[in-house]
């Protein structure tokens, strides 16, 4: 049956509701609220366990649960705070806070602010975030950001950034590499291990840490005083790459500007009509460029270097 609350309910037992209409408060540290066919919440809900098993629950105020389980649809402009639980459905809220071990195999969308200090995992899971932060761990298929997002924890996911993303933690591992598409501003101050990085035209990827990627497609600006190791890819005519240290391990087409301010190492084939600027470095592969400038010392061992002009 439907559960309608317009007053104040303290529940430390179990409420099974076909649908919920709550305009006031439902509290109880040990209580369980189970909703089988959605409803509306314009009040406050604070329970030990909240489970939504069917229908659509529209939450325009707040739900706080030690364990929050959803296999249906949560919509609205409210706030959701959970410590543990699982989501296999769709959750859309203005604000989402996760404080513990949470399994997401569905989709969680946070339109205003997302905060994770716990461990979010789940195959097939998708996080869509406007503004937010992660100080815990995120292991998901996809993380999409559109506002300001900071990571001080660990992330394993394919990341699409349309806002301002700052990484002060770790993204990807050798066993679980990330795929990053930057359509905004991306700053890495620590570690990124990626299978692929795409930096869009007129967008900026600043690396002051360490980036290792199997392949990169750079149509914008990749700058900073960090180190990058590239397994292959392309720097287009609109692309600019400037790093302290650059290592090329796979075939790479440079048609833009690429500068290594400290050290440069190439063991593959670099092709294209771009400009390559090197301080100190070594080449055991093949380099063909429009222009090569060496400010320090370049050691060529068993490789070939060809350019329209070479300045030393």
Protein language model features and the residues they cover:
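Extracellular beta-strand-rich, repetitive "passenger/adhesive" scaffolds
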Residues: 1-312
């Amino acid at each position: 049956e439907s559960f309608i609350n317009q007053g104040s309910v303290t529940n430390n037992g179990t409420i099974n509701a076909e649908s919920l209409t709550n305009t006031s408060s439902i509290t109880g540290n040990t209580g369980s609220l189970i909703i089988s066919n959605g409803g509306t919440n314009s009040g406050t809900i604070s329970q030990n366990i909240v489970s939504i098993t069917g229908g659509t629950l529209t939450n325009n105020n707040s739900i706080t649960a030690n364990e929050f389980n959803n296999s249906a649809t949560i919509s609205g402009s409210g706030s959701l705070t959970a410590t543990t639980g699982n989501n296999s459905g769709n959750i859309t809220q203005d604000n989402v806070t996760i404080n513990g071990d949470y399994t997401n195999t569905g989709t969680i969308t946070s339109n205003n602010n997302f905060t994770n200090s716990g461990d979010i995992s789940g195959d097939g899971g998708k996080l869509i975030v406007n503004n937010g932060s992660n100080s815990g761990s995120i292991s998901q298929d996809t993380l999409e950001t559109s506002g300001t997002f900071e990571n001080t924890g660990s992330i394993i996911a394919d990341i699409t950034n349309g806002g301002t993303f700052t990484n002060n933690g770790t993204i990807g591992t050798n066993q679980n590499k990330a795929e990053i598409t930057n359509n905004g501003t991306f700053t890495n101050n620590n570690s990124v291990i990626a299978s692929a990085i795409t930096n869009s035209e007129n967008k900026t990827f600043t690396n002051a840490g360490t980036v290792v990627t199997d392949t990169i497609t750079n149509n914008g600006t990749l700058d900073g005083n960090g180190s990058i190791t590239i397994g292959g890819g392309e720097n287009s005519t609109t692309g600019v790459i400037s790093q302290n240290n650059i290592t090329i391990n796979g075939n790479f087409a440079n048609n833009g500007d690429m500068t290594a301010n400290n050290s440069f190492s190439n063991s593959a084939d670099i092709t294209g009509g771009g400009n390559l600027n090197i301080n100190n470095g070594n080449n055991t592969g093949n380099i063909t460029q429009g222009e090569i400038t060496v400010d320090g010392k370049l050691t060529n061992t068993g490789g070939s270097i060809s350019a329209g002009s070479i300045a030393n």
